[in-house]
Amino acid sequence: MARNRQPVLKKCRALGIDPVILGVKKSSNRQIRPNANKKPTEYATQLREKQKAKFIYNVMEKQFRKIYEEAARKLGVTGLTLIEYLERRLENVVYRLGFAKTRRQARQIVSHGHIAVNGRRVNIASFRVKVGDIVSVIENSKNVELIKLAVEDATPPAWLELDRAAFSGKVLQNPTKDDLDFDLNESLIVEFYSR
């Protein structure tokens, strides 16, 4: 399986992302890149926005393109549907519910089989949850220290409901752009793929 092993701070600096979004509590001491004062081309801004979304959601190009194409086929605004599909991925829902401190940690928790959806264990990070689904930590994993610590600080968005005592959460509605925890201009991504 292909993985992005690039240093997080280096990539954050290149894309103009605050590392806190990714759960990294460090900051880079490096100066601004030499060509940072140049006005980027239209293509460069579109590419950067796409790369930012891919990096934050930890999705490779092939999978990201498939998600985009699926969103483009659906009726409605393509960019908002794309955001909805990315937010409804199981690894992201686990992170947003507060079972993990970062999206990367959430991906590992899912792939190690600590999460169940509607009572059935799911270990596929790209699994897409639906409205009404109940995402929970399996019984054996409720005393894993990482999950316990993460749930204490959890503040889920409005589209999710968290039950701290039961280590479970419910999807109340589909996420919208307002529910994002970072700035994303989805129209630039749509323009990039519709060239």
Swiss-Prot record:
Domain S4 RNA-binding: 88-150
Any one GO BP annotation for this protein: translation
PROSITE patterns for this protein: RIBOSOMAL_S4 (PS00632), S4 (PS50889)
GO cellular component: small ribosomal subunit
Keywords carried by this UniProt record: Ribonucleoprotein, Ribosomal protein, RNA-binding, rRNA-binding
Family assignment from sequence similarity: Belongs to the universal ribosomal protein uS4 family.
Designated name of the protein: Small ribosomal subunit protein uS4
Species: Fusobacterium nucleatum subsp. nucleatum (strain ATCC 25586 / DSM 15643 / BCRC 10681 / CIP 101130 / JCM 8532 / KCTC 2640 / LMG 13131 / VPI 4355)
Gene: rpsD
